[in-house]
């Protein structure tokens, strides 16, 4: 029978684990916390670790998620600004950074944030260099990601599901984001009179409405594009689940 987690026994348990076991447990509980929004078990585990383990990157990342779920914004910002994280952790921590600022601003304004307000928040609160490699982003799409998508678009304007999955892995985006980029790219070129009409097919039905790059130059003789809406509604943001190392043995978690 699987042993249930008992916070009263956590101090004894945490002192008996090796560093690798602590990393595996933290990563698993972190991923579970991202999915469920519940971090009580994660908090009990890391708070009872010996002081020498408190500076481990997996523990610091777990602490950041606990601060996020408990809406302790100041401590979250301080931790992310003062602790250097490895590049493979940047994306998930950047998501926490942005979502925390969005939630904090929405609570202050007592209303849901629009696209313009979120854009201003991102400009006012850039990522600290502890979770950012310094590469320029455009609507949260990195330059290298946009270049990969542009090259793929030149080869095929209607990628298959498998192509989208491959591009999502290459660009570190979701399949929906890749689908939206191709859809909006086709729409912009159609409006500019640049898309080959014979290539338009019924599979131009990807869901979503988020674009990533600027409009192409307009031809004076081309038909004018439809007017832009006066407001924009963004889909709710959910942090992406963290993918942990394959060597982690999660059998340790059964003993919690």
From Swiss-Prot:
Residue ranges for the region (Disordered) are 187-233
Native organism:
Caenorhabditis elegans
The similarity annotation says:
Belongs to the SIX/Sine oculis homeobox family.
Q: Which residues form the signal peptide?
A: none
Cellular component GO terms, alphabetical? nucleus; transcription regulator complex
**What does UniProt note about where in the body, tissue by tissue, this protein is expressed?**
Shows expression only in the pharyngeal nervous system.
Q: Which GO terms describe its biological process?
A: mesodermal cell fate specification; positive regulation of apoptotic process involved in development; regulation of DNA-templated transcription; regulation of transcription by RNA polymerase II
Primary location class = nucleus
Q: Which SUPFAM superfamilies match?
A: Homeodomain-like
| Name assigned to this protein | Homeobox protein ceh-34
Q: What does this protein do?
A: Acts as a transcription regulator. Binds to the sequence motif 5'-TCAGGTT-3'. Binds to the cis-regulatory element of proapoptotic factor egl-1 gene and together with eya-1 activates egl-1 expression to promote motor neuron M4 sister cell apoptosis. Also promotes apoptosis of I1 pharyngeal neuron sister cell. Together with eya-1, required to specify the coelomocyte fate in embryonic and postembryonic precursors. Required to establish and maintain the differentiation of all 14 classes of pharyngeal neurons.
A molecular function (GO) term: sequence-specific DNA binding
Q: Which Pfam families match?
A: Homeodomain, SIX1_SD
Q: How does it assemble?
A: Interacts (via N-terminus) with eya-1 (via C-terminus).
Asked if the keyword Transcription regulation belongs to this entry, the reply reads yes
């Amino acid at each position: 029978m699987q042993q249930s987690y008992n916070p009263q026994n956590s101090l004894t348990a945490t002192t008996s684990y090796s560093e690798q076991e602590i990393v595996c447990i933290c990563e698993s509980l972190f991923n579970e916390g991202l999915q469920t929004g519940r971090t009580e078990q994660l908090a009990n585990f890391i708070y009872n670790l010996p002081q020498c383990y408190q500076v481990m990157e997996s523990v610091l990342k777990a602490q950041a998620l606990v601060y996020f779920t408990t809406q302790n914004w100041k401590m979250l910002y301080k931790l992310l600004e003062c602790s250097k994280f490895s590049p493979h952790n940047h994306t998930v921590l950047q998501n926490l950074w942005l979502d925390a600022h969005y939630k904090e601003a929405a609570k202050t304004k007592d209303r849901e944030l629009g696209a313009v307000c979120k854009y201003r928040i991102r400009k006012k609160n850039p990522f600290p260099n502890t979770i950012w490699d310094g590469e320029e982003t455009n609507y949260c799409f990195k330059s290298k990601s946009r270049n990969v998508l542009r090259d793929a678009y030149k080869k095929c304007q209607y990628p298959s599901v498998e192509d989208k999955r491959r591009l999502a892995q290459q660009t570190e985006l979701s399949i929906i984001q890749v689908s939206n980029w191709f859809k909006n790219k086709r729409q912009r070129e159609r409006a500019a009179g640049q898309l080959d009409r014979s290539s338009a097919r019924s599979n131009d039905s990807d869901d979503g409405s988020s674009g990533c790059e600027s409009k192409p130059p307009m031809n004076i003789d081309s038909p004018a594009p439809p007017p832009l809406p006066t407001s924009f509604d963004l889909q709710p943001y959910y942090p992406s689940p963290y993918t942990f190392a394959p060597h982690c043995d999660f059998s340790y978690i059964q003993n919690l």
